[in-house]
Amino acid sequence: MKLALIDGEHYPDVNRWAIEKIKPCCAVFVGGTEKIGSIRDIEKALNIKVYHSPNIFEALSKAISENNITEVIDLSDEPVLTPNLRFRIASYLLKLGITYKGADFEFRAKEWKKIDIPSISIIGTGKRVGKTAIGGFVGRTLKELYKVVIVTMGRGGPEKPEVIRGDLMEITPEFLLKVSEEGKHAASDHFEDALTAGVITVGCRRCGGGLAGFSFFDIIDEGIEIAKSLNPDIIVFEGSGPTFPNVLADGFITITSAIHGTEKIEQYFGPLRIGLADIVVVTMADSVSEEKLKRITQAIREINPEADIHLTRFVPRLIGEVDGKAIIATTNPQSAKKFSEELEKMGIEVVYYTGNLAKRNILKDELAKVNYDDTAIVELKAGAVDVVIRHAFSRGKRVVFLDNEPKNIDGKDLKEAVINLARRIVNDKGN
């Protein structure tokens, strides 16, 4: 059934004229009183039930809960509904799988899929927010309690779902170089998660991403079936950039970077990603001011008051031993500098650092000019395998992988929060 959004900037007879054309079962009054007397006057004029509340979303929630709404038609306009508020409404409706349609726009959610195995979805408000680092953290946290399978969907993922037994094999630089030489993207997320979490991963691919975060093409359905066949206690889905699987998981962890501020949270379809969250992880919180962190926290709470917010920073976690002088390569110049300083405090002599893993040509030029004695320390991202590892091996150097470990700066415990979320989900499903 259809629901109409109406306002008091239109005369009641104009609203009635439009309502008769679209024939909704009910309406939500979204504000504006310039051309009306009272809500009762509108109800009499329209002859349908009109829901209203000072909070638009409370009125929408009540209308949707009492009616089988599949489509919301927006008959309002500015100044009552601003573009930002319309995106908030769209985010709210797409979360519920309801189409939102206006005079010159239509937002239609991909069908949300449900699975019978307990699941958590890790999604991001954008690229380079630390989503895969959190994915690995969640995987290695939960493997202490459950059999975990992580399902990824990357732009460099395989054409057919690929299983990596991170629980049984060691992900070595030599192995990844061989994978790269076979023409595969050896730094794809399912390899990184297998490396950092030590769990089974299923790599999938996707192409294209819509405004709300749904992909144009993906093979996630095939990936789900393979994941289920591995008999996990819990499946962890991991998005790609701002795009994520259209799986209505039992729990959501949304990742946003403090460096991005509130824009990715409040604007466009940021409210959808925040609104889905049980836990919101704010990464790189040590890189911004206290005032900016307060604004970020307030923005999250305004959209999702129930979300458990964690302010975190990343610290380097080495997967292997480092001896002698080393270089470090990451995808971010700021993190490269910061990590080099932290590794120096650990007794490692860093002779060069670069944040150009995602810029292969620049990276190659840098490495050609650098002399180092022993080890290349590298994140498993972008050009890590086909540039850094290949270069290091050609010079007889060792490679040690670098992981980004989240640490709370707010006195809270992200590990405990992840465990509690998983326990609730598993218990609710009776596993």
From Swiss-Prot:
InterPro entries: Cyc_diphosphoglycerate_synth (IPR016557), P-loop_NTPase (IPR027417). It is found in: Cytoplasm. GO terms for cellular component: cytoplasm. The keyword Phosphoprotein does not apply. It comes from the Archaea. It catalyses: (2R)-2,3-bisphosphoglycerate + ATP + H(+) = cyclic (2R)-2,3-bisphosphoglycerate + ADP + phosphate. Its EC number is 6.5.1.9. Keywords: ATP-binding, Cytoplasm, Ligase, Nucleotide-binding. GO terms for biological process: gluconeogenesis. The keyword Nucleotide-binding applies. GO terms for molecular function: ATP binding; cyclic 2,3-diphosphoglycerate synthetase activity; ligase activity. Catalyzes the formation of cyclic 2,3-diphosphoglycerate (cDPG) by formation of an intramolecular phosphoanhydride bond at the expense of ATP. Belongs to the cyclic 2,3-diphosphoglycerate synthetase family. This is Cyclic 2,3-diphosphoglycerate synthetase. The gene is cpgS.
